Amino acid sequence: MKIVFMGTPDFAAEHLRKLVEKKYNVVGVFSQPDKPKGRGKKLIPTPVKQVAREYGIPVFQPKSVNKGEGFEALKELKPDIIITVAYGKLLKQQVFELPPLGCYNVHASLLPKYRGAAPIQRALENGEKETGITIFKIDEGMDSGPIALQERIEISSDDNFGTLKKKLCNLGKKLLIEFLKKISAGEIKLTPQDHSQATYAPKITKEDTILIEFDNGERVFNKIRAYDPEPGVTTRLGELRVKLFGAGICDNCCVDAEPGQIISISKDSMVVACKKGAVKISKIQFPGKKVITVWQAKSGRLIEEGIKLGG
């Protein structure tokens, strides 16, 4: 079975590595074009490209795989199946109908919920108690094709974007190998999605990561953990913009302060008042500096009880 793999970030790269480790015949890899990063604007290869190079797999980075040279390169590979994981572009009919076994995507949500680019962050931000991995057959819609396999996992109160992404990546790799075994044996049965239950997970914008109001402790907790450890939620501290990490639920906090006011600072965390309830925060990042604990920030006289965040 000749596999063409399409993906771009580290989440996808881990799936590609698993395929190679399990001795699957990956005949080609498609990834988004390299992007300039850092002060020197040096072109950095995508994580998927790095893994493909490591194993000597041909890599293609066309502006579009749906037409022109990109599509011609794909046709020449004569894949039996295409697997996509966070590739970053919608595929047209001529692409997903090319391989005899079809074109399948590994998606980090329980479809039809959270179709789109940022399912992990949006699930956390909305306070979901569970999520999962769905492998589905690609059609002309966005994450709307029939489901081949799906498995759910619990979202714990300790999870943030980093920990949940790792859990889902491990589940995705396991499910992908299971899927390939089943499709090779002709054992895959497709189940149409219930489109009436669809929700969406749009791409993250800068505005999404800004925290203005400390209105509800649970909402603030979910927002901070949805973008922890990257890119971090930004809020105001006087004239500065700081990033907050390590949020926790403050169940038994006695709150009698203005929203955004720091009530207390301990070695573990600081408690910040909200209109409803409060939130614990353990780490903070000042502009141009490394992430430090709130206790280090207090010891360095960067924060103190009584000052306000937000606005």
UniProtKB/Swiss-Prot annotation:
GO cellular component: cytosol
Binding residues annotated for (6S)-5,6,7,8-tetrahydrofolate, in chain numbering: 109-112
GO molecular function term, any single one: methionyl-tRNA formyltransferase activity
Disulfide bonds: none
Keyword tags: Protein biosynthesis, Transferase
Catalysed conversion reaction: L-methionyl-tRNA(fMet) + (6R)-10-formyltetrahydrofolate = N-formyl-L-methionyl-tRNA(fMet) + (6S)-5,6,7,8-tetrahydrofolate + H(+)
Catalytic activity, EC: 2.1.2.9
InterPro entries linked to this entry: Fmt, Formyl_trans_C, Formyl_transf_N, Formyl_transf_N_sf, Formyl_transferase-like_C_sf, Met-tRNA-FMT_C, Met-tRNA-FMT_N
Pfam families assigned: Formyl_trans_C (PF02911), Formyl_trans_N (PF00551)
Enzyme class per UniProt: transferase
Source organism superkingdom: Bacteria
Family to which this protein belongs: Belongs to the Fmt family.
Function per UniProt: Attaches a formyl group to the free amino group of methionyl-tRNA(fMet). The formyl group appears to play a dual role in the initiator identity of N-formylmethionyl-tRNA by promoting its recognition by IF2 and preventing the misappropriation of this tRNA by the elongation apparatus.
Protein name: Methionyl-tRNA formyltransferase
